[in-house]
Amino acid sequence: MKKRLFRLGALCCVAAMTITTSAQALSVEEAYDILQRSYVDKLPRAAQDAKSLDELFSYTDDYTYYMTAEEYQAFLQGVEGDVSFAGIGAEITYVPEGIRIVSVLKSGGAEKAGLPPGDIIIAIEGESCAPGGAEHRAKLLGEAGTSVTVTVRHADGTQADYTVTRALVTQTNTTVSVTGGVGYIDCDSFGTQTGTYFQEGVRGNDSAVRAWIVDLRGNGGGLTSAAVSALGAFSGEGDLIYFVDQDGESAAQRYSGKDLTDKPAIVLMDSGSASASEIFAGGVLGTGSGIVIGTRSYGKGVAQVLYDESNCPYLHGDAVKVTAYRFYCAGGNTTDRIGVVPTLYIPQDQAVAAARLLSGEKTKDSAYLRLVLNGCDFYIDIPAGKESSSAALEAILTALTPDAVLYWGENGGERKLTLAQAREKCGFAASSALDFSDVADSEYAQEIDSLAASRIVFGDGGKFRPDATMTRAEVCALLAQALDLYSTADGYFTDVGKGSWYAPSVNAMAAIGLVSGVGGGKFDPSATMTQEEFIT
């Protein structure tokens, strides 16, 4: 089942074009020709014998598919910046059970009806929408003022019906504001005007701010060119994204202007931040322009091109979206599957408060904490932080690793502190709930603590047991859990049976090159290693 993330039409792509409608449809042979010329991976031999478009596109990734003229019109509405469309007002992703609600748009019908993000629409007007797909999404769209009844499965397994009134939702995808010396850019998607909004917002307000908070939570992506333009306001001139095509040829997308600020960016992300959002966030990290806080992002490291009647003779109002490139952020790292790992893992209910605390200033009359993160200085006013956002302050100190560079400022001077000392100075316990009591003597203590702070590895009862052994199969299971990756494919190793409990994890890790066999086509799943060997 393909997993697609978009805002009722907003998807990450390299470019978008205008269209006219037509009843003529794309043939399987024509679609195969498009894919063979552009798709980033080699198509399997079986794809040549596909009997339908659905069968053909089943051999591609989650982001490559055909759009009818009507679906393409809806798609274009989502990537052109400030748009109006009649729908339920929700950002969605397809899952095998139906349609998952990633977020709801302000003033949209979903918000008014009380549809909660994270729930799954399993039926529309009483008809199952499993597996989720474009044909079901179309049922959520309609004329403004009409209603649609959806059956939703909540996180606890219970179900409920909601009647949602479709509304003409006007969505400005980027807003810029300044409060108390802190700039706040709220960006819901990267459309054609987003780069301009960022550039004008930073240029016009930079003299009034100490730091810039860029909120990309729930931002499913958009145009890569918009992400590069927005990032350039903070990074300045340079190659900010690299594309690699089916032939292994690479090309860089360069920003040629000057940076518009020397203030650090604090990027807010969550699991709904994808694609162009990850280009921006990964670029901020790669160029040393700031930090990322929140939770790990979605993990989409491929870019698409759009084919329509303007650039393909086979198409007449309809369109094909094709994954044509793998992309790499400034600094050379990929976000594919893994996502952007935040500098500070902060629970979402504390993320905004934590960002504002990190946007403090070097005070003269009260104690402050200076954090050096990714080459940038961040100041926390301790008395103000403890009074207004004690939970957020504790979340920041919990997210830091023992090697964090911290300075305590007071009475005109500064002195360096350890993380434990900083926690105590702020009124918290020297150790956090994530600290392990049995790793201090391990030569890999720093690596273990860093991964624990990022919520990538977990202990049990405050212990990590670094000398305990794990089988190679168990290592793959831990990696799969950390990366949220599993595979139904088989054939990588002769001793990894398709029905074994570890096969999905081992095959997924082998597919992305994180593990290899021991020779002779074998993996040796029951061979052991220590946990600290696993960390390295």
Predicted features and spans:
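PDZ-domain C-terminal substructure recognizer with occasional recognition of PDZ-binding tails
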Residues: 100, 122, 135-176, 323-324
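Sec-dependent N-terminal signal peptides of Gram-positive bacterial secreted proteins and lipoproteins
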Residues: 3-25
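Feature responds to low-complexity, polar/acidic, surface-exposed segments characteristic
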Residues: 4-5, 409-445, 458-473, 480-505, ...
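PDZ/PDZ-like domain segments forming the peptide/carboxylate-binding groove
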Residues: 26, 83-131, 192
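PDZ domains, with a preference for the canonical peptide-binding region formed by the helix
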Residues: 120-151, 199, 226, 301-311, ...
